[in-house]
A protein has these predicted regions:
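Formylglycine-dependent sulfatase
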Residues: 1-420
């Protein structure tokens, strides 16, 4: 791995949402969505329509991205193993100023992870743990809410205020306090503030982690109204499909019913209207994030960075949203393991290219390093996509010479998957 400091290297902005499905960007063939800013990235960049995660949960997927390997190599199989990134510090050694704003899911949460600065936001629906709890956490968003004298909405406040409504809402709530204190707005605004306030001229690596559209599905009224009359092409699973699923999937569905994970009070025997409600709230949260992506792009332009910046948009895994009777993650269905992946950099990345070749989300790691002039480790399982980004997908060059001919995901057993 060789490194050379060069202040003409491109800035790199990695935007990662949490739990966003691949069918949530209008320009990629999903007209029920309203995502003008993500559409712009797609039109002016290269998007991968078959990008699959290495694990269908947050921490193990992110560890693969930031360690360049599958979970069986990183030894991070669930959301509870300790880990930190390795290649962020390599960017720092190569002259990059490295900043994380929002969700990273490093464990422990407040570890540096190779970043010069971290403004982390992790606990969208979790209480402030007691100080003697092994996962005690008080993040930037908690501090901002406290400074404004606001109580953070969570499953605890919602059960306290209206238990019956909580149990019937399937995790769908309208944001209850100041709009700018919604965690996705807070993260997006913090990223804009950092870009506006920065005075240094060295290249930067900015990782922006939006907490949404991970549940609770809690958009503001403004964005929920956009989807008031939208009909989504998704329907409830049949009783026949549910009965034919393996025992571990039946037990997983029951765990969702029993434990109200992340404010989602799940139930069996959903109706089509239940599915439509889930997608309306979820899509509204995606559109909120889309607006913030647009504001970040505008700020990069205003600050004079846009011509020398690579923007990458992706998500750590997706969400079943009622498909196959499941909610959230933990399964290997396509609707959970396939995620959006878009590269934008007009002078460095081929424009208006939609690539159907198989890639893994972790492949962005060596790709970023190569853009920064750093040779990725030869023993990494992640593979660089730079040739595809600059010269075209393999099916346009040599169909027999693909980056991957298969993708692979894995997951360890935890307290949620009692039947695994």
């Amino acid at each position: 791995m060789s490194q050379k400091i060069d202040h003409q290297k491109p800035n790199i902005v990695l935007i990662m949402t949490d739990q966003q499905r691949a069918d949530t960007i209008a320009e990629l063939g999903h007209p029920w969505m309203q995502t003008p800013n993500l559409d712009r990235l797609v039109k002016q960049g290269t998007s991968f329509t078959n990008c699959f995660v290495t694990s269908p949960v947050c921490v193990s997927s992110r560890a693969s991205v930031f360690l360049g390997a599958y979970p069986h190599t990183t030894n991070v199989y669930t959301n509870f193993e300790t880990w930190q990134p390795n290649w962020v510090s390599w960017l720092a050694q190569a002259g990059y100023h490295c900043v994380n704003i929002g969700k990273m899911h490093i464990n422990p949460y407040d570890a540096k992870g190779g970043f010069h600065q971290r403004f982390f936001v992790e606990n969208k629906d979790r209480p402030l743990f007691l100080e003697d709890h092994e996962r005690a956490l008080y993040d930037e968003w908690d501090k901002a809410l406290k400074a404004r004298g606001l109580e953070k909405p969570s499953r605890y406040t919602r059960v306290r205020d209206d238990r019956d409504a909580f149990l019937k809402n399937l995790g769908c709530f309208t944001w209850e306090t100041d709009d700018d204190m919604h965690p996705d707005n807070f993260v997006g605004d913090t990223a804009v503030w950092w870009l506006e306030d920065r005075k240094a001229s060295s290249p930067f690596f900015l990782q922006i982690g939006f907490p949404g559209p991970h549940p609770p599905y809690d958009p503001t009224d403004e964005f929920l109204a956009i989807y008031k009359d939208t009909e989504f092409p998704h329907r409830a699973a049949s009783q026949q499909e549910l009965a034919q699923q393996p025992k571990m999937h039946q037990q997983l569905r029951q765990s969702m019913v029993d434990f109200n994970i992340d404010s989602v009070a799940w139930r069996e025997n959903l109706t089509d209207e239940d599915i439509q409600r889930l997608h309306r709230y979820y899509a509204a949260n995606v559109s909120m994030i889309d607006q913030k992506v647009g504001q970040i792009m505008d700020c990069l332009d205003k600050q004079g960075h846009l011509d020398n910046t690579i923007v990458i948009f992706c998500s750590d895994h997706a969400d079943a949203l009622g498909e196959h009777g499941h909610i959230q993650k933990w399964t290997m269905y396509d609707c959970v393991t396939r995620v959006p992946l878009v590269f934008w950099a007009p002078d460095r990345v081929k424009q208006q290219q939609q690539c159907d070749d198989l890639v893994q989300l972790m492949d962005i790691a060596p790709t970023i390093l190569q853009f920064a002039g750093i040779d990725p480790p030869s023993n990494w399982e992640a593979l660089a996509m730079n040739k595809m980004l600059t010269s075209g997908c393999w099916d346009e060059q040599d169909p027999n010479e693909k980056l991957r001919d298969h993708v692979y995901a894995e997951l360890g057993r935890d307290h949620i998957q009692s039947g695994a």
